Amino acid sequence: MDGLNTGEEEDSAFTSISLTDDTDHSLKSLHSGAERLFPKMMNADMDAVDAENQVELEEKTRLINQVLELQHTLEDLSARVDAVKEENLKLKSENQVLGQYIENLMSASSVFQTTDTKSKRK
């Protein structure tokens, strides 16, 4: 019996190795780890793309608002130019009327007329 006991002691000293195919189990655990990792990476990538799109959208919105503001400013300036042109034409017309009036007054006044009598006195 000593031989049997010795054999049992020797067997317990060795590590038992399973002869079943463990590659399936290790691949499954690797695959499940990758499944957990990829969605996180995809979510992070999607978040980065979403943030990038959000920044781009905000920039486009800001530029559109700026363009609209500039268009309104241009319309206001154009209206002001038209008003100034009208006022200028009105003032030119009034100046012509006043110029003609002054010319008529000067020709009717004896102060501004040259007389032959003054030149004859000398």
Swiss-Prot record:
Alphabetical list of Pfam families matching this protein: DUF2205
Q: Does the keyword DNA damage apply?
A: no
Annotated region described as Disordered, given as residue ranges: 1-26
Q: Which residues form a coiled coil?
A: 43-101
Compartments (UniProt record): Golgi apparatus membrane; Golgi apparatus, trans-Golgi network; Cytoplasm, Cytosol
Q: What is its main location?
A: Golgi
User: Which topology term describes how it sits in the membrane?
Assistant: Peripheral membrane protein
Alphabetic keyword roster: Coiled coil, Cytoplasm, Golgi apparatus, Membrane
Gene Ontology CC entries for this record:
cytosol; endosome; Golgi membrane; trans-Golgi network
Q: Which GO terms describe its biological process?
A: positive regulation of macroautophagy; regulation of protein complex stability
Biological role: Positive regulator of amino acid starvation-induced autophagy.
- Can you state the subunit structure given in the record? Homodimer. Interacts with ARL1, ARL2 and ARL3. Directly interacts with FEZ1 and UVRAG. The interaction with UVRAG is reduced by amino acid starvation, but the complex is stabilized in the presence of FEZ1. Interacts with NRBF2.
* Similarity remark: Belongs to the SCOC family.
Would you tell me the protein name for this molecule? Answer: Short coiled-coil protein
* The organism of origin for this protein: Rattus norvegicus (Rat)
What lineage, starting at the top, does this entry show? Eukaryota, Metazoa, Chordata, Craniata, Vertebrata
